[in-house]
């Protein structure tokens, strides 16, 4: 029993092609080409995958391209049920939720030896608040990221890359 799928085309500045798959009766986009990080990140973290376009819905694809399939009429993909950031509990709608996800994900990385994780934020405002407030010292000079590091007894360093600002994704690196 195979998975129903199709090739879809569209364009930004150039023509582009990716896949759609049908899982549990709903269609999703998968674009492994656009989920590949930049050359600099790939060199440092060769196994990194971004997951922005993994089991995503139309609205995410349409942020960056125009779907104009010449091969077939693509079905509607309007479910986020299997979207990576939802399934992995890496999607935050508030700053407090983002802090909780960051702390839990740091703990998982420390326990497993993984070097990085990603979270996606609900809005551009939350993205800006998170990237700002994480490193903003309070009246005692302590930042939220410092609090997380201390609470986990982590002896290394946690940094973040706001590499995917347009998509509201932050990559955290533990070293």
Which ranges hold each PLM region?
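N-terminal accessory/pre-domain segments preceding catalytic cores
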Residues: 24, 47, 52-175
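Hydrophobic/aromatic-rich core segments of domains that either
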Residues: 1-55
């Amino acid at each position: 029993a195979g998975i129903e799928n199709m090739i879809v085309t569209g364009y930004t500045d150039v023509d582009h092609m990716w896949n759609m798959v049908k899982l549990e009766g709903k269609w999703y986009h998968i674009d492994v080409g656009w989920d590949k990080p930049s050359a600099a990140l790939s060199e440092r973290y060769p196994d990194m995958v971004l997951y922005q376009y993994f089991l995503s819905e139309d609205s995410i694809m349409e942020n960056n391209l125009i779907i104009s399939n010449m091969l077939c009429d693509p079905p509607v993909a309007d479910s986020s049920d299997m979207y990576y950031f939802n399934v992995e509990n890496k999607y935050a709608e508030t700053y407090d939720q983002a802090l909780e996800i960051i702390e839990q994900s740091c703990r998982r990385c420390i326990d497993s030896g993984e070097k990085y994780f990603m979270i996606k934020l609900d809005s551009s405002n939350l993205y800006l608040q998170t990237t700002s407030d994480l490193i903003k010292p309070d009246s005692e000079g302590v930042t939220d990221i410092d609090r997380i590091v201390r609470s986990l007894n982590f002896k290394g360093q946690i940094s973040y890359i706001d590499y995917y600002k347009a998509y509201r994704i932050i990559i955290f690196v533990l070293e």
